[in-house]
Amino acid sequence: MSFDIAKYPTLALVDSTQELRLLPKESLPKLCDELRRYLLDSVSRSSGHFASGLGTVELTVALHYVYNTPFDQLIWDVGHQAYPHKILTGRRDKIGTIRQKGGLHPFPWRGESEYDVLSVGHSSTSISAGIGIAVAAEKEGKNRRTVCVIGDGAITAGMAFEAMNHAGDIRPDMLVVLNDNEMSISENVGALNNHLAQLLSGKLYSSLREGGKKVFSGVPPIKELLKRTEEHIKGMVVPGTLFEELGFNYIGPVDGHDVLGLITTLKNMRDLKGPQFLHIMTKKGRGYEPAEKDPITFHAVPKFDPSSGCLPKSSGGLPSYSKIFGDWLCETAAKDNKLMAITPAMREGSGMVEFSRKFPDRYFDVAIAEQHAVTFAAGLAIGGYKPIVAIYSTFLQRAYDQVLHDVAIQKLPVLFAIDRAGIVGADGQTHQGAFDLSYLRCIPEMVIMTPSDENECRQMLYTGYHYNDGPSAVRYPRGNAVGVELTPLEKLPIGKGIVKRRGEKLAILNFGTLMPEAAKVAESLNATLVDMRFVKPLDEALILEMAASHEALVTVEENAIMGGAGSGVNEVLMAHRKPVPVLNIGLPDFFIPQGTQEEMRAELGLDATGMEAKIKAWLA
């Protein structure tokens, strides 16, 4: 869409942060109003992350107004909230392309803008990176300031606290802003607290505090008295004891929607030495009532009509794989009170809403804490329960040592329900489920299953749940199932594939939900088609049978080729000295960018047309 200057006259004056800093302060509330309306107008037309950005408009304006970005370095955690940042940093007219193939990246991205200091997508990385950036800035001696913005969800992760603990030790000059949008601003976060925050961040208070510490540093009783007095005074009005104990100077909480108040506080804090912590309270979805009332639903939105206040409803077609998992989870829990389900803050995305309501005492949302989720599951298994960890492929990467050390070595029966495996679409490089087969396949005695449809997915979940000799994993994609009939649950024979079609010279060994595309290719080329089902243990007998009865083999998977299921087939053939040609089809050796799943599969040659073209070129 073209930018309407008449509709957004103040925003039209801001093509860069340099122009933003030329505006009089009195015009900034109007700028915030226009920025919020422009965000609503843009995202409702194009889709994207929505409610978080509405809540950070004033903070974004204030930070870029006070700090000399991009010289001063502003780091956004995760990046859902960074749409206003993109709009103010030269990308205003392209915001309608966000999350689309070839468009703006969904998160801050170093290759896109000098204002994007850190490429992000996963949570809780900002403070660690910020410490490194602040230390580097100090060593180069250019008085470059560092600011990290982190949300109340991301700060729950252990990595954030590890970083703050380190910052308290080495004391770099940096500011951490906690964007706390868990609740609306209450009365005690009003004028009095804002005044106190400005006072506590001001030069008089800082000078008295630091001066007093220096003067009485050699007099232990007085020094301790000063410290206790300061703690008592601040403790009466400031809920920041934890952050103070970690070594930060805590200011807040303050109203995150008072742009002028934020500017005053940020200016006061800008030149303070050591690690500073500013706690702001915001409303997720601010300025758009439907998003304020239901920020979870409006977190990420498709195209919608903002005047209706409603998101378009599902067409009522086939269920998603997440829904298939959620239904199986409820069905199994109703029969077995030993079932325990765990998610690291992905209840809705993983299809666990119904389970959480029906079985609240067996549902555990551990927040953004993937490492803890896995070891917590290990403890439940040791205690005689049957834990299921529902987790996205890309987030399981964050708990790899726990899978190895805490689950697999001890042969604990933990089932990993791995959602969003393969190409996920619009969230791009940071969220593609490209590597789980590669990083799990090397774990001794782990069972790994790849269903080709929703019925097989249910059977594999059932099989993994009843597998007691160690961990198991079922990986399934983002998106809808294919519409096959659901049959009664039964355990599959471990490590056994099935032949779906008999052909002649070529055999296609398929792993996972690319099966419908592989079936089209098999029909076109008169090839044998095998549903391998298990990546580990592989059906070696079936692989050797296919090698003996065909001139060439093709493996198909939606995982990185390197180290994936196809690599496993190659290893089997080499171990048995079978010199049959093998073509491995899967994800190439680069990070897959954003685009719809259909667009990216077509581009990477993972649809039927692309697979057939690759096979014909290879056979030529």
UniProtKB/Swiss-Prot annotation:
Record GO biological process: 1-deoxy-D-xylulose 5-phosphate biosynthetic process; isopentenyl diphosphate biosynthetic process, methylerythritol 4-phosphate pathway; terpenoid biosynthetic process; thiamine biosynthetic process
Necessary cofactors: Mg(2+); thiamine diphosphate
GO terms assigned for molecular function: 1-deoxy-D-xylulose-5-phosphate synthase activity; magnesium ion binding; thiamine pyrophosphate binding
Annotated EC: 2.2.1.7
Keyword Metal-binding assigned: yes
Cofactor note: Binds 1 Mg(2+) ion per subunit. Binds 1 thiamine pyrophosphate per subunit.
Catalytic activity: D-glyceraldehyde 3-phosphate + pyruvate + H(+) = 1-deoxy-D-xylulose 5-phosphate + CO2
Positions contributing to Mg(2+) binding: 152, 181
Pathway annotation: Metabolic intermediate biosynthesis; 1-deoxy-D-xylulose 5-phosphate biosynthesis; 1-deoxy-D-xylulose 5-phosphate from D-glyceraldehyde 3-phosphate and pyruvate: step 1/1
Gene3D superfamilies: 3.40.50.920, 3.40.50.970
Domain of life: Bacteria
Keyword terms of this UniProt record: Isoprene biosynthesis, Magnesium, Metal-binding, Thiamine biosynthesis, Thiamine pyrophosphate, Transferase
Residues given in the record as thiamine diphosphate binding sites: 80, 121-123, 153-154, 181, 288, 370
CDD domains: TPP_DXS, TPP_PYR_DXS_TK_like
InterPro entries on file: Dxylulose-5-P_synthase, THDP-binding, Transketo_C/PFOR_II, Transketolase-like_Pyr-bd, Transketolase_BS, Transketolase_C, Transketolase_CS
GO CC terms in record: cytosol
HAMAP family the record matches: DXP_synth
Family: Belongs to the transketolase family. DXPS subfamily.
Subunit composition and interactions: Homodimer.
Biological role: Catalyzes the acyloin condensation reaction between C atoms 2 and 3 of pyruvate and glyceraldehyde 3-phosphate to yield 1-deoxy-D-xylulose-5-phosphate (DXP).
Protein name as annotated: 1-deoxy-D-xylulose-5-phosphate synthase
Organism whose genome encodes this protein: Escherichia coli O6:H1 (strain CFT073 / ATCC 700928 / UPEC)
